[in-house]
């Protein structure tokens, strides 16, 4: 006779977030917002994403298919939802926060090859599901500081019914059995579509989605009803009855004004209080001090600033998700709204193209990327911003392009990166020594870049040191190429300063033009956007947006005491002289 199981109500609680009917309903933001609410109630929350694709990680996936790759401090290449988790929880997560089918199968097959299964026939159940469970339960262990989480929120990627998601859902069902029903909460995100011709909200898709979930042994405790409008009480009652969920657990979530309003929406519907009651968590009121201040800055900006994001993947904004969130957070730091102008880098290859694309912006951001496509356009945008004193921030590839443009401006006409032109006579950007076997095709491409957090030392009094308020910083990285130190002296003749390096001085981490040459022209080999939080904006982005605001204010026409406008722009002769200088510089740097 099997023994009865007893479970402690004080154990770490597990919340599983699944999705149904359609993808892109906002499971990640829902999970992040619930995590934020529980954190604001004084609980220690950690989060995890289970991705059903067979890739080991998203590091080699096409940005147009997957969006950005979010890098953690420990060097894991993870799903972009992990970025949402870090931003909403305001805490760093490890590579454990992202589990893929590829990782699970790789581990299980490796164990089989080592003979760890003692001759068993290896199957999806129990071997694959056991490996998934071990990774879920590992999140409930102490963190690096020795703190055990009160709650683990696990988002299950895909939708119910996907064949790829079934092992993860089965593992989640087994976790409930293993740790006790009182310690597990299932939250299901479903679509309630509105049919305009009939003027009705339809509940059948949600009913079918919940039925599919129940077929595999999971009864949801609460439903997130996604719709473009409020779900009326009568419909909530119907869904509660047909899906066997408490009415208090039917949460209407219409589209919010901003993603930062989602916690307020969930709280107003009582989701966090319902979860606390169901899991027996200690009840504390939500402390809105920090998040309320954020919402005030989101909805009551004093200024608006326009930033051009000159990128290669602008057709899919998710490819730059952390960059755009960091820009917006930089705006919050300055009580300003950042409007992003999405500029395909190809559009800036010519002076006329750059003028058309960048003529009305207050700042230019050059993000990371790979490959030669669009590089000349990035160089054109950099040249345009340098000549016209428009604030610029370069990230990763952005730094490399800034260095190439500076080198070309001092006579190294064919200066280039070994990534784009392996045979260039002036490889001002070269392959890192430990990456040469990868470039030669003699090692794996995935997971082999310089990944994770690395320290840097900043030059005292530099623009970046003033922005950070420190001369020692740590930032996350993801790259294979570096500034070629053999060209540092020649590049410095352009006025560009190498204002931050690795502690040993070998690897260039930051470059800038001094403040007396340009109001703000900074680039970094790192990805500082990955450490920005809406409630704690990254200092580089805050300084960049501040410079863009000052640039905007300087462009305005002041009014004298008699009410007459005084021209705050150059005279026609001065503009003509400037255009001549720009044309000469453009021809000189184009080679």
Curated annotation (Swiss-Prot):
EC number: 6.3.4.2
Entry binding sites for ATP: 24-29, 81
Keywords from the UniProt entry: ATP-binding, Glutamine amidotransferase, Ligase, Magnesium, Metal-binding, Nucleotide-binding, Pyrimidine biosynthesis
GO molecular function per UniProt: ATP binding; CTP synthase activity; glutaminase activity; identical protein binding; metal ion binding
UniProt-annotated binding residues for Mg(2+): 81, 155
Activity modulation: Allosterically activated by GTP, when glutamine is the substrate; GTP has no effect on the reaction when ammonia is the substrate. The allosteric effector GTP functions by stabilizing the protein conformation that binds the tetrahedral intermediate(s) formed during glutamine hydrolysis. Inhibited by the product CTP, via allosteric rather than competitive inhibition.
Pfam family, one: CTP_synth_N
Binding site for CTP: 23, 162-164, 202-207, 238
GO cellular component annotations of the record: cytosol
Binding-site list for UTP: 23, 202-207, 238
Keyword presence, Heme: no
Catalytic reactions of this protein: UTP + L-glutamine + ATP + H2O = CTP + L-glutamate + ADP + phosphate + 2 H(+); L-glutamine + H2O = L-glutamate + NH4(+); UTP + NH4(+) + ATP = CTP + ADP + phosphate + 2 H(+)
Keyword ATP-binding among UniProt keywords: yes
Enzyme class: ligase
Pathway(s) annotated for this protein in UniProt: Pyrimidine metabolism; CTP biosynthesis via de novo pathway; CTP from UDP: step 2/2
Amidoligase domain: annotated segments: 1-281
Entry-linked PROSITE patterns: GATASE_TYPE_1
Active-site annotation: 396 (nucleophile), 527, 529
GO biological process: 'de novo' CTP biosynthetic process; pyrimidine nucleobase biosynthetic process
Domain Glutamine amidotransferase type-1 as annotated: residue spans: 306-554
InterPro entries cross-referenced by the UniProt entry: Class_I_gatase-like (IPR029062), CTP_synthase (IPR004468), CTP_synthase_N (IPR017456), GATASE (IPR017926), GATase1_CTP_Synthase (IPR033828), P-loop_NTPase (IPR027417)
Region (Disordered): 568-591
Protein family: Belongs to the CTP synthase family.
Subunit and partners: Homotetramer.
Biological role: Catalyzes the ATP-dependent amination of UTP to CTP with either L-glutamine or ammonia as the source of nitrogen. Regulates intracellular CTP levels through interactions with the four ribonucleotide triphosphates.
Protein name according to UniProt: CTP synthase
Organism field: Rhodococcus jostii (strain RHA1)
């Amino acid at each position: 006779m099997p023994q009865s199981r007893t479970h402690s109500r004080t154990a770490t609680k597990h919340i599983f977030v699944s999705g149904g009917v359609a993808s892109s309903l906002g499971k990640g933001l829902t999970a992040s917002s619930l995590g934020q609410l529980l954190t604001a109630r004084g609980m220690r929350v950690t989060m995890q994403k289970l991705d059903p694709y067979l890739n080991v990680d998203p590091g080699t996936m096409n940005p147009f298919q997957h969006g950005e790759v979010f890098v953690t401090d420990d060097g894991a290449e993870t799903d972009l939802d992990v970025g949402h988790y870090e931003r909403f929880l305001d805490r760093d997560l490890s590579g454990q926060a992202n589990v893929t089918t590829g990782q699970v199968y790789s581990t299980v097959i490796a164990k089989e090859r080592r003979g760890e299964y003692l001759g068993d026939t290896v199957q999806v159940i129990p071997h694959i599901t056991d490996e998934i469970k071990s990774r879920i339960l590992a999140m409930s262990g102490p963190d690096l500081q020795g703190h055990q989480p009160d709650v683990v929120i696990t988002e299950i990627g895909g939708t119910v019914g996907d064949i790829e998601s079934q092992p993860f859902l089965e593992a989640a069902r087994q976790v409930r059995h293993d740790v006790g029903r009182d310690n597990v909460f299932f939250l299901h995100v479903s679509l309630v579509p509105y049919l305009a011709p009939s003027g009705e909200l339809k509940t059948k898709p949600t009913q079918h989605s919940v039925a599919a979930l129940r077929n595999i042994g999971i009864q949801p405790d609460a439903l997130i009803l996604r719709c473009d409008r409020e779900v009326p009480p009568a419909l909530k009652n119907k869904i509660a009855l047909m899906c066997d969920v408490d009415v208090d657990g039917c949460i209407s979530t219409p589209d919010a004004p901003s993603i930062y309003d989602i916690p307020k929406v969930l709280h107003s519907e009582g989701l966090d209080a319902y979860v606390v009651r169901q899991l027996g968590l200690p009840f504390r009121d939500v402390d809105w001090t920090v998040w309320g201040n954020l919402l005030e800055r989101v909805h009551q900006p004093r200024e608006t600033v326009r930033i051009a994001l000159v990128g290669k993947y602008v057709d899919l904004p998710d490819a730059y998700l952390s960059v755009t969130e960091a820009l917006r957070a930089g705006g919050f730091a300055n009580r300003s709204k950042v409007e992003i102008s999405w500029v395909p880098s190809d559009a800036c290859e010519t002076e006329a193209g750059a003028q058309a694309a960048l003529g009305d912006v207050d700042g230019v951001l050059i993000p990371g990327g790979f490959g030669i496509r669009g590089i000349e356009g990035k160089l054109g945008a950099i040249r345009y911003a340098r000549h016209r004193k428009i604030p610029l921030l370069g990230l990763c590839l952005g730094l490399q392009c800034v260095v190439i443009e500076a080198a070309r401006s001092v006579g190294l006409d064919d200066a280039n990166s070994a990534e784009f032109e392996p045979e260039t006579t002036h490889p001002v950007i070269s392959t890192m020594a430990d990456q040469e076997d990868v470039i030669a095709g003699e090692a794996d491409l995935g997971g082999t870049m310089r990944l994770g957090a690395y320290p840097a030392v900043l030059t005292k009094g530099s623009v970046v040191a003033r922005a950070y308020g420190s001369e020692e910083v740590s930032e996350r990285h993801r790259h294979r190429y570096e500034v070629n130190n053999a060209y540092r002296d020649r590049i410095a003749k352009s006025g560009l300063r190498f204002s931050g390096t690795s502690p040993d001085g070998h690897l260039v981490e930051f470059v800038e033009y001094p403040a007396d040459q340009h109001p703000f022209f900074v680039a970094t080999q790192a990805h500082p956007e990955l450490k920005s939080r809406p409630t704690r904006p990254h200092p580089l982005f805050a300084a960049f947006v501040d410079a863009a605001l000052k640039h905007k204010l300087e462009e305005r026409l002041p009014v004298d005491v008699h009410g007459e406008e005084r021209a705050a722009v150059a005279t026609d002769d001065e503009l003509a002289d400037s255009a001549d200088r720009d044309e000469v510089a453009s021809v000189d740097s184009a080679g």
